[in-house]
Amino acid sequence: MPKRTDIKTILIIGAGPIIIGQACEFDYSGAQACKALREEGFKVVLVNSNPATIMTDPSTADVTYIEPITWEVVERIIAKERPDAILPTMGGQTALNCALDLHRHGVLEKYNVELIGASPEAIDKAEDRQKFKEAMTKIGLGSAKSGIAHSLEEALAVQAQIARETSSGGYPIVIRPSFTLGGTGGGIAYNREEFEDICKRGLDLSPTNELLIEESLLGWKEYEMEVVRDKKDNCIIVCSIENLDPMGIHTGDSITVAPAQTLTDKEYQILRNASLAVLREIGVDTGGSNVQFSINPEDGRMIVIEMNPRVSRSSALASKATGFPIAKVAAKLAVGYTLDELKNEITGGATPASFEPSIDYVVTKVPRFAFEKFPQADSHLTTQMKSVGEVMAMGRTFQESFQKALRGLEVGVDGLDEKSSDRDEIIAEIGEPGPDRIWYLGDAFRLGLSIDEVYAETAVDPWFLAQIEDIVRTEALVKARTLDSLSAAELRLLKQKGFSDRRLATLMKTTAQAVREKRIAEKVRPVYKRVDTCAAEFATNTAYLYSTYEAEHGECEADPTERKKIMVLGGGPNRIGQGIEFDYCCVHAALALREDGYETIMVNCNPETVSTDYDTSDRLYFEPVTLEDVLEIVDKEKPVGVIVQYGGQTPLKLALDLEANGVPIIGTTPDMIDAAEDRERFQKLLHDLGLRQPPNRTARAEDEALKLADEIGYPLVVRPSYVLGGRAMEIVHEPRDLERYMREAVKVSNDSPVLLDRFLNDAIECDVDCLSDGKRVFIGGVMEHIEQAGVHSGDSACSLPPYSLSQATVDELKRQTAAMARALNVIGLMNVQFAIQQKGGEDIVYVLEVNPRASRTVPYVSKATGISLAKVAARCMAGQSLDEQGIHDEVVPSYYSVKEAVFPFNKFPGVDPVLGPEMRSTGEVMGVGRTFGEALFKSQLAAGSRLPEKGTVLMTVKDSDKPRAIEVARTLHTLGYPIVATRGTASAIEAAGIPVRVVNKVKDGRPHIVDMIKNGELALVFTTVDETRAAIADSRSIRTAALANRVTYYTTIAGARAAVEGLKHLQNLDVYDLQGLHASL
């Protein structure tokens, strides 16, 4: 059936901020869908609260709303835009849940809007655990023995029933809440106490207060099938995926391999037929789904775990692994096409989309964790997802792609590095999976354990264990050799197994440089193969490439052109401190330079992103972003310029080495990047410009640090040099804390010194993004942070334009920014962080740090001002001046845009959610309003902090915050919210003549604050404490209780003031489209 003509306007719901379990794969699918539907002549309206996405670029959809994704707000957009249909399958769980809410509240009916891509019935049947189980039984597929519970009593009854059916004693047992994402709130319980804890949390987090309690399948094998089905019942399997880690670990936290490696042909056909039966029964007939299976290795019993009736993390992986654009195809199926009518773009239309992709290589995905940011979190892997990003690699064999993926992770390893030689530690680590288990598996074989012994501890399939054992055995042989004694054939064999130059250098006690020179001399070089969906049966016209070491005269398919090329280095895996914002910049660089007639080359290894989409750049190399891999590509392609300032710290770390190897880096020079990063050089630069910095010193030993600290005076910010995301930063108030820090943090510093800065109390922090062509400096935007200095800039909310600074201060910030940009000869982007302290009625400006690269605020500033800074800066790097691009005056919008950070604390119950100098947010949202208050309120709503319409507010603040707390209390009282406060705070509020009730601090006896939070007596909590370790520890129970009981809380007085500002706007919400806002500038 050709496309439908009865619908004209389609609303796409995005996925919102990046959280654990829902990352930038939905930006990739949403951007694809917008493109696909506009190609077909539909008008596309998009809503997404995340400004760091490509899909919210004003050019991606026809009308773009950066607004909170709640059904009430989306209803306003529907009323304004009157779409004919909603496509809810591109925005992950957020979009599905929002679409179901619209359905339940009668909004779809009221405005006569149809859901396309998946019907409410199909979504419900797939997402509602009980209905799904009944559907599976109906088509004769097994599912785990389980039951549904809506209360703790029911849950215990189900558990007892399963214990009787499975004769397993009833533990371990798995708990899965309905309609949540990435297994949120779920887990595995090994005893009754754990069971009750997990059930209570799960009931609370499930929007339908429903749990599925099921038998434990720990140790079973897990597989996924990516399936696409159309109205005519054409079905194709895009890709089979096998989890290296057995059941019991969320698939998002597992190492996965495609295509599945350990299935026999017969088993594969059984899974294939089963997955098609599942789609038919659930009723998915216009798009993609992923179906997860589990197989008991003992007796072959197969069961269906779950299916997602939408584009998912796995489908992004399958798209990148095969080159088959699932999201684009699913969007076209949703408007009536069938698979045989669509062409496969990769083969230039030589094959229809109804051909199943076949691949002649192996793909390995490895997750990236961020537990170093959450030392109190439980790092054991269970059914609740905890990873923050992932790396994908391709090779001709499992070993090659596996070792490439490990070095692409950027966790300080070059392959299967040694973790430990302590037998007890190794046995414990392989038995209880944590983020490093794969390296401990290598250590187990180094100890001499057999495959059977390791299998007994881990339940990892013996085929994978044999591959890992072989890598370890090979390493032992290499250790006994010298580099000179290796023949070309031996070296090639090692490279075919995926060993990196650096790993070989470590094993043979030499340098990576020496290994590289030997390789070049012996002509052992990689060849590049194309991803073509058809195992090279048809010619492909897209250059989507990966490296591999083949036999001596292996055919290289790179086939470089003679055009002028610019190469962009991507940011590698998502992590806290380096996320989608950097990918956004890389994509914009590729798009801008492509428009200008350069051939663009992208190098990256993150499968979730738009940058690794085969049609973002002219040529895509899906490779780890390491020196060895980048130098080989440069040698092949010979670009005229390489951009390193867009991918965050990942490419920057390579800048000096690349330059030393003759790679043409364009934009700000690596030497100047170093001048800004190196403490002593930067100090001299500021001194020459006559700019202020907080008093600071550099210490190289503990005793020296204590002496220097006394010179500056406490409180201090201490940190190692060269960090991103504030890793290992702390605010210390006394020598005792500093001693402890020096003992613990020297581990972090790799012989690099520790930096001490005077901490500026009660300062306002600001960010300025600017760009320069080497002559003129253009200010992109000045942002004022809402949280005070001392909260990491990535975790602070901020406003553009500033909401409280005087024009004179803003002008001074711009003057200082321009002076530094000139002194550093910046070509491209630069970001400066300032702190402003009031002394005697005057604003004193201090420079905190300068980053001569793209910063994480670039996408937000671009959305707020309507100028794509990353595009303009990329053109500057390629030699176009600002005048030639017609960029003259800074844009200061007449409306406010507020960016707010989003945190993963609900995934890590043990972690204290207090904000500090370490960055811990995973994503961001933006709110737009005519006033600062309106924009702020929307940013809170979008970040999931519900501001209550009524109810009691608790205030407990440190002494220095009391004057401002009185103002907050006065507004609350005027708005009609009753106030309770702890003794000290209450007497200050009372003295100002505002009614308040006194409550007990936790140490003053019961009933105290935490009891009130647990009993649901409080609607909002404002709690601020001194930055001392003791004060933070004392008050921790208030914050964790508020978090656990889902009471909205603010831990800074600035946040509290902002929240109260937002409370004034509860009733009247307006929605604004980006195109309309930009047109008004």
UniProtKB/Swiss-Prot annotation:
Q: What is this protein called?
A: Carbamoyl phosphate synthase large chain
Q: What is known of its domains?
A: The large subunit is composed of 2 ATP-grasp domains that are involved in binding the 2 ATP molecules needed for carbamoyl phosphate synthesis. The N-terminal ATP-grasp domain (referred to as the carboxyphosphate synthetic component) catalyzes the ATP-dependent phosphorylation of hydrogencarbonate to carboxyphosphate and the subsequent nucleophilic attack by ammonia to form a carbamate intermediate.
> Which classification does the entry list for the species?
Bacteria, Pseudomonadati, Pseudomonadota, Betaproteobacteria, Burkholderiales
Q: Name one GO molecular function term.
A: carbamoyl-phosphate synthase (ammonia) activity
Q: Which residues bind ATP 2?
A: 719, 758, 760, 765, 790-793, 833, 849
Per the record, the gene is carB
Q: How does the annotation summarize its subunit structure?
A: Composed of two chains; the small (or glutamine) chain promotes the hydrolysis of glutamine to ammonia, which is used by the large (or ammonia) chain to synthesize carbamoyl phosphate. Tetramer of heterodimers (alpha,beta)4.
Tell me its cofactors. Mg(2+); Mn(2+)
Binding site residues for Mg(2+) 2:
306, 308
Query: Which amino acid positions bind Mn(2+) 4, per UniProt?
Result: 849, 851
